[in-house]
Amino acid sequence: MASRTTIGLAHCYLGHGGGEVATLWAIQALKDEYDVTLITAGDVDLTELNRFCGTCLREGDFRVRQAPVPAWLRRMRGAQALRSALHQRHCRRLAGEFDVLASGYDPCNFGRRAVQFIADLGWDPQLRGTYFAEDEGRLGSLPGRLTRTAYHTLCRALTQRSGWNTFRGDDILVANSAWMAAVIRTRWPSSRVEVLYPPVAFRSGPLPWEQKEVGFVCLGRIAPEKRVDAVIQILSQVRARGHAVHLHVIGPMDGSPYSTRIERLCRANADWIQVEGMKAGLDKERILTAHRFAVHGWAGEPFGIAVAEMAKAGCLPFVPEVGGAAEIVGCPELCYHDASDAVTKIEAVLKSDALQEELREKVRRSACLFGSDVYTAGVRRIVGLLGASTSARRDREWALAR
């Protein structure tokens, strides 16, 4: 019997985010046809990952190869760039062992062609400066330009350049929205880009509209780029206009300076804001389905899997007009360009039952694009494009010979 094609799938650190959901579902998509190995620098708690991502993977469905990263560094908040450098160097050392290579979260320079599933834009300094807000608690953002420069110079040195150009058109870059694909093509005109929306595994059916609370949810990591403080300010202004709405903030309060500030802000408005903390699975779905509306704050987020979850739950999510989240809702009435515009559009929807009904149908149709079946079929198709390449075997032989 012929041996199965081997694939090395890299993800530096599996936490609780959209990149993890996409990576776990990629393994789910590939495990029956490929011999899959996950290359990571962090721990793998499969029970927790299945619970968070909605997958049903078992021990034995894939192998795990861990990069030799010290335990203290694996758990250190804010050391993403350093962990990534050590992880990427390890991936390049292992590259020759696999027929096909893929990165589940942002580009990984394996020194040969690969499929690059890109979850955000924070890995590129130019794009990070445009679309990301920095937290003063991150190691990569310590005070002082010289300190930051020295830190990132160290990380680049540890990565060890391979001479391979990921953006010249040999690698397949998989963007999670048409918006992000356009950003990548503008930044790297020679790159080869495919668009594949991430999966949303939502098991609960939406409640009837009349049974939902006239309130809002805000879902996701409590991080500066998510702009949870802006969401609170928007809804505070909506309340000032006479609408007695409330807010549930769902996301892990991890003790970072930003999350501490958000906790204080929520406590100061405890009469209408409830902090739910980290929620997953049915616990999260119960809160989402019980509410009519949602607000998302990150302008320039490539996709926004939290927004897709809220849409699947039957919410009407208000999102920034810049970024992939606007593709999820598909309605200009739900997309805002600044806080004032958000307040105006929220109030218009709150005042009109007819508009709510019209938008609900549009969002419902749009949410159908984000099923796990659509995603897994797309993963198999895109990985197959690389695996079927006549030069894929030569790439592996070249990597082994280095």
Briefly describe each language-model feature range.
Residues 353-400:
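A charged, aromatic-enriched C-terminal amphipathic alpha-helix characteristic of glycosyltransferases
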Residues 251, 259-279:
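Nucleotide-activated donor-binding/catalytic signature segment of Leloir-type glycosyltransferases, i.e.
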Residues 174, 206-226, 232-235, 248:
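Conserved donor-binding/catalytic core segment of Leloir-type glycosyltransferases
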Residues 315-319:
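Short hydrophobic beta-strand element within catalytic cores of glycosyltransferases
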